[in-house]
Amino acid sequence: MWHNISPRTASFPLAGDVMAIQVTLLSHSDDPLRSLYMAYRTCYSQLTPQQVAKRIGDDRITREEMTQFIEERLKTGHASPLEQVSYEFGISGVSRAFSHQFVRHRVGISFEQQSQRYVTYKEGEFPYTVPETVRKAGMQDRMDELFDRVGELYEEMVAAGIPAEDARFLLPNATNTNFKITVNFQSLLHICDLRLCTRAQWEFRKVAALMRSEVMKVTPELGRYLQPKCGEHRLGYCDESEKDWAACPIGRVRPHKEVLFRIYEAYRKGETQPLREQDWDVIEEKDLVILGD
């Protein structure tokens, strides 16, 4: 059963582009927290799903209890119940460079994308994204001029009877496109694990952040789990290369897995000692990631 809601939108304007990135939550599973709790509880209870639903309806199970139970289950890695909760998004103003990455997510997500075969750009004017780095380098004017010429040639081709499916070969990766997607919560978690990471391409990070923002508005109990994989509600540590971890702006507060292994090995060998009171005089608090006890 789907819960239809008034469309709500999160957007991210980009300097110099024709369209802003917009992400709108169109609908979602009816009461995602309840649905997810029932899915998990069915696996770990003698009660039938109908009996669990009645207990929730009778207020014998609170939302706080449901949230706590789900959190405990998530820590075990039991993921299949997450597939029973789905979100439906409208995404617009994104580039084809983004879309080629987006559609690589294939499990638990379905896409419908604006076609360049059936949609013809009027007067050769196609919306496109200008990266901030291009604008800061003072090269946006040259990019605009080039795309103006592309648009003119595109229009001439269509006017000459060349099908849009062939004229589109001219169009650049910067060309904007639109999506309507349906994604289950397990897949959305995986997307955010990877695409909220600072190593992900900036446009994908923006889209993932806007999707998270939309989910937080309707189910904050679940939205808080939409983090990069190093987040406190996910792995809690970085498993990328140590070089990438060292360059990450949040690397100071998120340990790398190899660092954890080295700390454990030192502890196992008895090479560590608890933090002493006098140690605070020589170690700045901001540099402390893991403390002895």
For each of these PLM feature ranges, what is it?
Residues 2-293:
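Family-specific signature for flavin-dependent thymidylate synthase
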